[in-house]
A protein has these predicted regions:
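Extracytoplasmic/periplasmic/luminal assembly and interaction segments
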Residues: 48-93
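Short acidic/polar N-terminal linker immediately downstream of export determinants
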Residues: 19-42
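Extracytoplasmic/secreted envelope proteins and their assembly/folding machinery
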Residues: 66, 71, 89, 121-123, ...
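N-terminal export/assembly leaders
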Residues: 150-242
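Single-pass transmembrane signal-anchor helices and their membrane-water interface zones
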Residues: 2-25
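Short, small/polar residue-rich loop motifs at catalytic or cofactor-binding pockets
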Residues: 34-36, 61, 111-113
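Short, polar/charged, low-complexity connector loops/linkers at domain or secondary-structure junctions
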Residues: 84, 89-94, 99-186
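His/acidic/aromatic-lined binding-pocket segments of jelly-roll/cupin-type domains
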Residues: 39-40, 47-48, 57, 65-68, ...
Length: 242
């Protein structure tokens, strides 16, 4: 698997054009487990924070500083590549295309049908895999989703919850309960399900990602819901019984 991973980086076109297969994450250069976050510093000074269940490959050559997101979510603070007289381009490759920062701090999340980018400082250019023409520029305080063909919609303004996971916090602001539980599900083994009867309840609050049991207890205390455990690994949030 490692040998194959190296081949993916044999030139920018070969690397970014390869099909993305789930098993490639198994042999990734850096991985995190469910519920784990990890910070690494690359040779050029770039800092990468890996969120839960994330896998990346890293490849630097004479022209490019490459990070390939195979699964999950990362926060990137781009380094200056100061050891080089001419800094190399930093490229974050995803299943849907490339993200090229312009001196910036940004996050990239693989969402299955699209890639999500949030920009906190500076700007990034997004190059969908099959798109032609100039790559759109996303500036600080904005985010965008993109597929292999194009941006999935106009850039959006970032909310207060964007990037909070780096500090181990999940921020909900009038969020559907079903959407909150889908986020919690990313951070614990097994499954967290939401019954349709309570899916549209609205939730606001700040929750600790490192203690998902506590989050579930808090929801039970503050909403008209109950939490049913078939086991620790199969949890369903349902309407509270009278």
């Amino acid at each position: 698997l490692k040998a194959l991973a190296v081949l993916l980086f044999a030139g920018g076109g070969a690397w970014t054009g390869q099909a993305y297969l789930p098993w490639r994450a198994w042999g990734a250069d850096v991985r995190t487990a469910l519920g784990e976050r990890r910070t690494i510093t690359l040779a050029d000074g770039t800092t990468v924070v890996l969120n839960t269940d994330t896998a990346i490959d890293i490849r630097f050559d004479d022209a490019t500083r490459g990070v390939r997101l195979l699964r999950g979510e990362i926060m990137v603070t781009s380094g200056r590549d100061a050891a080089r007289a001419v800094p190399r381009a930093l490229v974050i490759a995803t299943a849907h295309g490339d993200v090229r920062p312009v001196g910036t701090r940004f996050s990239v999340r693989e969402r299955g049908d699209a890639t999500r980018v949030d920009v906190f400082d500076g700007a990034v250019r997004i190059a969908p895999r099959r798109a032609v023409g100039r790559a759109p520029l996303i500036t600080a305080g904005h985010g965008a989703d993109f597929t292999r063909d194009a941006l999935a919609g106009p850039p959006r303004v970032l909310g207060a919850s964007a990037g909070a996971w780096v500090d181990g916090i999940l921020v909900a602001s009038n969020l559907r309960l079903a959407d909150l539980l889908a986020e919690i599900d990313r951070y614990r083994p097994g499954r967290v399900r939401c019954d349709a009867a309570v899916a549209n309840l609205r939730v606001s609050g700040t929750y600790p990602l490192d203690d998902t049991d506590r989050i579930l207890d808090t929801l039970r205390e503050t909403l008209p819901v109950d939490v049913e455990y078939l086991s620790r690994y199969w949890v369903t949030v349902v309407a509270a019984r009278d």
